[in-house]
């Protein structure tokens, strides 16, 4: 018996269905990460992945290995947990985007931390992350993020409008 599942080959050929976004979830505990990945799987519209370690290098490696299109990172504002604060999670986002420029990154945090709103807004303004959610994450919000991700995947896969497929424009 193999412990590792074979990866499904990407959809290709005429009539192949558009590939679903690969959505990675990295929460503050492995149990919450598993629960989030299961929830994403039940929601549909993506291929979920749970990243059980929230160490920056581990997250970057796994996102790169799995070619994640979307990354959900949970924040933790407990005392003494700086690596899970806005700046620590933005560090992960920057490193993931260095390897996967098209990967969309969203931060999730619980209610009750209005003092963090300015930092979250600044992270979006600086394009370190694509967005955030404060409070309970709704299925509608995730579907919106998945739709945005699928749209950006489609845009990235299509040739520029002034270029014919299979041909390169001269610079």
Describe each model-derived feature in a short phrase:
Residues 48-54, 108-161:
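Output/docking surface of receiver
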Residues 25, 106-107:
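Structural beta-sheet core signal
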Residues 1-39, 138-171:
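Non-catalytic signal-transmission and effector/linker regions of two-component phosphorelay proteins
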Residues 70-99, 109-119:
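Conserved phosphotransfer microenvironments
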Residues 41, 63, 97-98, 124:
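N-terminal cationic-hydrophobic initiation segments that often serve targeting/anchoring roles
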Residues 52-70, 80:
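Acidic, metal-coordinating helix/loop segments flanking the phosphotransfer/catalytic sites
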Residues 30-55:
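Two-component/phosphorelay signaling modules centered on CheY-like receiver
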Residues 100-104:
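A short helix->loop->beta-strand "cap" motif at the edges of active sites that frequently abuts
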């Amino acid at each position: 018996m193999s412990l590792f599942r074979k990866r499904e080959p990407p959809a290709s050929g005429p009539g192949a269905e558009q590939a679903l976004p690969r959505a990675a979830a990295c929460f503050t505990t492995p149990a919450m990460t598993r629960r989030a990945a299961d929830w994403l799987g039940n929601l549909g519209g993506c291929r979920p992945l749970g990243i059980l370690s929230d160490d920056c290098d581990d997250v970057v490696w796994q996102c790169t290995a799995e070619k994640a299109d979307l990354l959900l990172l949970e924040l933790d504002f407990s005392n003494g947990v700086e690596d899970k604060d806005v700046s620590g999670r933005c560090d992960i986002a920057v490193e993931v985007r260095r390897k996967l420029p098209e990967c969309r990154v969203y931060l999730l945090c619980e209610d009750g931390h209005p003092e963090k709103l300015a930092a979250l807004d600044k992270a979006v303004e600086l394009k370190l992350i694509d967005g955030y959610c404060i409070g309970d994450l709704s299925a509608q919000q995730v579907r919106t993020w998945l739709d945005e991700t699928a749209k950006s995947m489609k845009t990235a896969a299509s040739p520029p409008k002034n270029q014919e497929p299979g041909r390169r424009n001269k610079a």
